[in-house]
Amino acid sequence: MRKYQQGVGLLEAILASAVLGMALVAAGSYYKREAELMIKSSNAFDVIELSSQIQRYASLSKINNRTNPILKDNKAKEFKDADLKWLKLENCLTAGDVPTTGNNNDLQDQFIACDADYRKGDLSYFGSQFEFSTYVHPSNPEIQRQIKQVVSYFQYRGMERAFIGDAAGYVISEAKKKGFSAQDYRIVLIEPDRVGYFESNVISYEEFIENPSARENFLLKATKDRTLALAVSLAQTGEIAMQRDGSVAFLEDTELCWDTAAGSAKSCLSVRYDTVGNKTELDLKQIDVVSAKGLSFESDGKTKTPVVSTYETFQDGGRAKTINAIECPTGLNNRFAAVVSSFSTAGQNANFSSESAKDSQGTTQKDGSKGPHALLSGISLNWTLTNKVWDVTASIGIESGILPTSGIDSGSLLRNPKSLSFIAFQWCEN
């Protein structure tokens, strides 16, 4: 009677293990697909990060909203200093230090201090303009649009007058004339006194960031105490999809901007304009613009950045998996989560056709010979953050000593096995 009861228990355990195996396979396929989809959300983060790069070098000086059409007609309060401060780096100059635009090994940001003015002028970020084209991803049909072009707008202030124009078409045409790739970042100066006219000065994004003297010459040579706008343009091609928060795919008619105060989507700002006589009017419906508040979103009362996900596998046999932490804006902390993607204990030649055939050349037999099949009893993932690196460890419980005649069940614990894969999710949160 005891043997019969034990046999039934084994059969039930084997069936349960088979069901668990199918569930793990299904879960692995699901999470891998989700990871592929969510990885595309990093494109949104990359585009926003490129915009914030220049903002880090900008001062927080207030712009004259009386002469600037964007601030005049589109709620200047959305560009308050407090809303922009989190774009600054944490390791700022201390009080009394003199800001410099030269190389400084003590600063990650070698161009300007957190609260210091740009040495020879002010550069302020307004927003990023996104133009989309219809696109259906072959593997993820729910994604129905891709970025066609991004133009980020900044203002260099030399005097009272200010003007922001649409430089998207000009940037592409000029890039082609000069033999530049349409995918390169271009920075263009816009003449404030002549609508539709653009300065011929064009500098690459890389040169603007990496060459302080070239950047200063670019700003000073063309401006000569005039106030000009900067348009930083990036043309995106290929399988690129935009997602707002790393989990909701953008459909073609989905609004881009997120109102953190209201906790809902809202109409975006625009830099498209019409000039009638001496009056400049902005069309708020033509093009999406992410304002300073659009760089993060509100969820459950917390401010978060878009989620970045990667597909990871333990490779070093028994060692923890290390993953570099993403950079977070000032005031936001790193967050991490991991979900098991796939794991198999069956090995090859597993046979579950009957209660008596429960053998496999699996993980319990080092020499590859037949033996008792390892039954999975549990998986756990743990992670810690040390020096901007996530250390992920895994523990797998295996009932390795089940024998129908001995009545002995000696379990074992497997740590960080090579066969275990998981999806890692990272984001920043206050």
UniProtKB/Swiss-Prot annotation:
What does this chain do? Involved in TCP pilus biogenesis.
What ranges does the record list as Polar residues composition bias?
351-366
- Classification lineage: Bacteria, Pseudomonadati, Pseudomonadota, Gammaproteobacteria, Vibrionales
Look up what happens after changing residue 202 to A.
In strain: Z17561
Domain of life assignment = Bacteria
Protein name from the UniProt record:
Toxin coregulated pilus biosynthesis protein B
Region of interest called Disordered, as start-end residue ranges on this chain: 351-371
